[in-house]
């Protein structure tokens, strides 16, 4: 999978999780974005079940922002086909989130959660290149 480190960092900073970003590798930034989205999806599901409409709308909005951050972080120059497929998947997820928000549809949230978990598992299986570099090399990442 291909992502731009700068875009991922700005997207993650925009959701208020600055503490872990400072020293994180680009690989870790994407993991943090995905973890943040999954945490908020679980929160939104509970808010729908408790009829917390205002909170649910805000939480789903944050998930949409995170997924947009993942989408704009894609590096289309590295693998055009994969990045286009991921962009289409992120667009689909956001459309499902909008439907979930409008209709209080827990099944749409569950679908997005499942898709994002699958992506995160694939991403987590990719070794972080900074683990294999010497200290002098990590500064260039």
Regions found by a protein language model. Name each.
Residues 1-43, 47-50, 55-61, 68, ...:
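N-terminal intrinsically disordered, cationic/polar leader segments
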